[in-house]
Amino acid sequence: DRIGFVQTTVNIPTQMPSSIDDIDVETAHKYKDLHEAGKDAEIPYNAMMLTTIVAEALRICRFENGPEYIPMSLTAFKIGDVAFVGIPGEPFNGVSKGLKAAEGWKMVCPVCLTNGSTGYFPMQDSYEEGGYEARSSEFKAGVAELIIEEGRKLMEKV
């Protein structure tokens, strides 16, 4: 009872192209082709905005035809009253705060890049702000909150 391990697979909704994207699918393909040809200078953006637009274009092209969901493995293990929650990507700080708020643990240690790297897991408000991580993320808004919810379920089971 002092040591435990659980794992689950969660189907995470992907951020497929939509009307909220700053660029349409046709433009995304154009920017992707220019970028892959080493012609970023022909894309009408500079500095970090160029990086953001290219990342968004690559995401739009990648998910143009789906899939609607990506299976993601979450893990949790405990040593006594210390819990570790494994997340296969780069969660925003709010994910850590949400997991650490779970009651009954002396310490909760979120561990990123566990069993893979599926990208960024921005909080809902980051999607509303529209920054690089949210615009390039493979996942729909709400992914971070879903990870918190599923991570807490694992912590209850472990």
Please identify what each model-predicted range represents.
Residues 1-158:
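Non-catalytic substrate/cofactor recognition surfaces at enzyme active-site rims
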